[in-house]
Structures are given as structure tokens and as C-alpha cells.
Regions:
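Charge-dense, helix-prone N-terminal extensions
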Residues: 1-117
Length: 117
């Protein structure tokens, strides 16, 4: 999956934004909370970090190219270092799921505000 496709998909999710952070990382956020980190090596993707449910963690990290994300909450974030480990459709599904998990943890008032926008 190419950077343009991942960026376009992530920004198509309601109220998502992107900033460049921590050097060469694109950090996608909703209401100021991150749901996707894209590591960059120039114009090439050097891995994705996404949120997952703790019960999904073991199955995901058993896939070659998917590991526990460094510097993120244990068993809640995974790093996809090899983008061929998951199909493009599965990556989209996982990015959307990460977004939904982050939105679900936002305060109810913030969620209500997002729905009204």
C-alpha cells in the first residue's frame, strides 16, 4: 500500500487530522488523540502503528511483520513493519478499527460534539 493511499484513507475518516511529529512520522488523530502512526523513510513507509483490542493482540503479533509497537501501551498497539503482511483491505479495516477504538474512548461530550459537526 502506498503512502498516498494510506493518507487518503485515514483522512477520509470523520474529523481526522494529520501532523508530522517525532521527526519522520505522520501522526493521524481524531479530537487530538492518535489512531495511526506512519513511520517514514523519506517518501517510503517504514511501518504503521495502530491500536487494537487486547484480545486481538496475540493473533496480530503472530503474523510475520507485525510486532508490539514500541513506546505504546502494551497489548493495545501493534506495529506493522512489513506492509505485505496484511492485504490492503485488511490494513484499511485495521486503520478504521483503530480510529473507532480511539473515538470510543473519547469523553461522551467530545463524541457528541464530533457527531454534530
Amino acid at each position: 500500500m502506498r503512502l498516498h493511499a494510506i493518507r487518503s484513507f485515514a483522512l477520509s475518516l470523520p474529523h481526522s487530522t494529520v501532523i508530522k511529529q517525532w521527526g519522520e512520522h505522520l501522526v493521524f488523530k481524531v479530537a487530538g488523540k492518535m489512531f495511526l502512526i506512519v513511520g517514514l523513510d523519506g517518501e517510503l513507509i517504514d511501518g504503521l502503528t495502530i491500536k487494537c483490542l487486547p484480545e486481538e493482540f496475540d493473533a496480530l503479533t503472530e503474523i510475520d511483520g507485525v510486532t508490539q509497537a514500541p513506546y505504546c501501551a502494551k497489548r493495545h498497539w501493534v506495529r506493522v513493519g512489513d506492509l505485505t503482511a496484511l492485504s490492503a483491505a485488511e490494513l484499511d479495516r485495521r486503520i478504521r478499527r483503530s480510529y473507532e477504538l480511539v473515538v470510543a474512548k473519547l469523553p461522551k461530550k467530545t463524541q457528541a460534539t464530533l457527531r454534530q459537526l
